[in-house]
A protein has these predicted regions:
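A short, N-terminal "cap"/entry segment at the start of jelly-roll beta-barrel domains
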Residues: 1-30, 44, 79, 110-111
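Short, conserved beta-strand element in jelly-roll/cupin
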Residues: 36-38, 49-64
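A generic "binding-loop/recognition-motif" signal
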Residues: 28, 39, 50, 69, ...
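Short, charged/polar surface micro-motifs in flexible loops or helix N-caps
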Residues: 28-30, 38-41, 61-63, 105-108
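Ligand-binding loop in jelly-roll beta-barrel domains
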Residues: 83-109
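Histidine-centered metal-chelating micro-motifs
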Residues: 42-44, 63, 79, 83-89
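Conserved short histidine dyad/triad with adjacent acidic residue
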Residues: 18, 33-48
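Short acidic-glycine-tyrosine-enriched beta hairpin
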Residues: 69-83
Length: 111
């Protein structure tokens, strides 16, 4: 997959005033997705009971909360999220905050 052409190759699974989410690569047990979070918006936040997750920030700036920790993020930052930790992303910039998510596949992902 040519990562620069992801939108032509990806499956758009969410599109609303807050963000767009694309599934880029789905393996038997692993997903790679892209979130484009609009300025001034935040994700709903969630946790995965036992699965770890990795976020790779590719554009924009903002903040991620992982449990009680608040971390400023920008392009090229990587954040590891341990299983069971609630996490939420905030776009504090004036442009779209884009990040890759790498996580274990789960039932109902595309709903």
């Amino acid at each position: 997959m040519d990562i620069k052409q992801y939108k032509e190759q990806a499956k758009l699974i969410r599109d609303n005033e807050t963000y767009k989410v694309y599934d880029l690569l789905t393996l038997k047990d692993l997903n790679l997705s892209l979130t484009e979070l609009n300025p001034g918006k935040e994700t709903a936040g969630h946790s995965h009971k036992e699965a770890d997750e990795v976020y790779v920030f590719i554009d924009g700036k903002g903040r991620i909360e992982v449990g009680e920790e608040r971390i400023a993020v920008k392009e090229s930052d990587v954040v590891a999220i341990p299983g069971g930790k609630f996490h939420k992303v905030f776009n504090e910039g004036e442009s779209i905050l884009s990040f890759w998510s790498i996580f274990e596949k789960y039932e109902g992902r595309d709903k």
